[in-house]
Each structure stands twice: as C-alpha cells, then as structure tokens.
A protein has these predicted regions:
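Non-heme Fe(II) oxygenase metal-center motifs and adjacent flexible, charged/small-residue loops
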Residues: 1-202
Length: 202
C-alpha cells in the first residue's frame, strides 16, 4: 500500500497496483487558484439534479455543471447532462493541462461541494462515451478535501490523498477498471470546493 510520504506532488506516478495516478500539488499558484475559484463560482451555470440510489430518489449532494467544445451530452448515474459552450476561462485552464497531458479534452464536468455535507459516492468514471482506459484530469480550487480510492477486488487496498487548491490530479490507464473513488462527507468545518474534471468524450 502506498505510504502518503511517497507523494511528492511533482507529477511523479503514485505506486498503486492496477492504477496510473499523477499528482501535481501546486500546478496553479495561490493567486491563480484564488482567482479561478472566484470566477468559476460566480459565472458557472450551476444545477442540482435528482439521482437514484437503490431505487430511491434524492437531490444530488453537490452542484454540477457541464461545459464542452461540442454538443455531445454526458450521462452518469441515470443523469443526462447537456453541455454549455466551453468558456474562455475554462479553455485557458484546459490549455495549461494539455502541456502535461498531451490529451485534447472535449468536456469538463464541474462539481461544487458547498460544505462538508456535500459528497460524491463510490464510483468509477467508466461510462461508454469515455472509451477504454480514459484519462481524467482533476483540478481543485477552494477548500482542500480528501479523495478516497479503493480497489474493486482487493477490498483491503484503500488510499486517500488530500487534493489541495491549485492541484492537478490525473487518473489514467486501467485505473477506472480496477479502482473506485469518492469524495466523502466530513464533519470538519470546510468551505466551498470547486472541482473540474476534464475528460474526452468520444
């Protein structure tokens, strides 16, 4: 199991079996992160959808938005989202990520976690429209939150990493095949976190 002390935060691959993960702790400096946080918070077309869990319908415990450079919808957990046009601000962030990913992303799913009660349950980003072995680029602004992973078969394999404001976290290779991930609720006093997950819809 990976020792948290092994996380260098400089993009060095993290040593988890069946996963390809990279973490850049300070990909954006503090001023950049604060400015992006404020602008995205104020200008995003936020929505809150209903979601079905074990046959029961709930309001999704976070706010979301979808932007893309095309009109292709994105579906997950019974929710179908239709994208807004990619903004100049989001394209600016995407271009920065391209420099270290060599991937042309088409779409960004944005999540706003308003406080510690907002969460995102165990799941994998393995929807058909993402293709095989997708690359997901996750950018965080605002409050820090723990990102949890657990292996699908080897239940004892669990890991968590604190995603800090201004950080960039990649999930690549067979990560979505072998691992689930979540943002869990927390009783700690935390402020708003905005998370952008860039992906390629095919």
């Amino acid at each position: 199991m990976l020792n948290p002390l092994d996380i260098l935060g400089d993009g060095t691959p993290l040593n988890l079996p069946g996963a390809k993960l990279r973490y850049f702790e300070s990909f954006f400096n503090k001023n950049e992160a604060d400015n992006y946080f404020s602008q995205i918070l104020d200008t995003t077309a936020w929505q809150q959808d209903k979601i079905k869990v074990y046959g029961k319908t709930y309001m999704q415990p976070r706010l979301t938005a979808l932007y893309a450079n095309n009109t292709i919808p994105y579906s997950y957990s019974g929710i179908k989202m239709y994208p807004e046009k990619m903004t100049h601000l989001l394209s600016e962030i995407q271009n920065r990520i391209h420099n270290v990913s060599n991937t042309i992303f088409t779409t960004v799913l944005i999540n706003q976690y308003r406080d510690g009660n907002d969460s995102n349950g165990w799941h994998a980003d393995n929807e058909r429209e993402l293709g095989k072995n997708p690359i997901i680029a996750s950018v965080s602004f605002g409050s820090d939150r723990f990102f949890h992973l657990k292996h699908r078969q080897k239940k004892e394999l669990r890991f968590k990493i604190l995603l800090k404001s201004g950080s960039l976290f990649f999930m690549e290779g067979e990560t979505q095949t072998h691992w689930l991930h979540q943002i869990a609720k927390t009783t700690q006093a935390v402020g708003i976190r905005i998370n952008l997950t860039f992906r390629k819809i095919i």
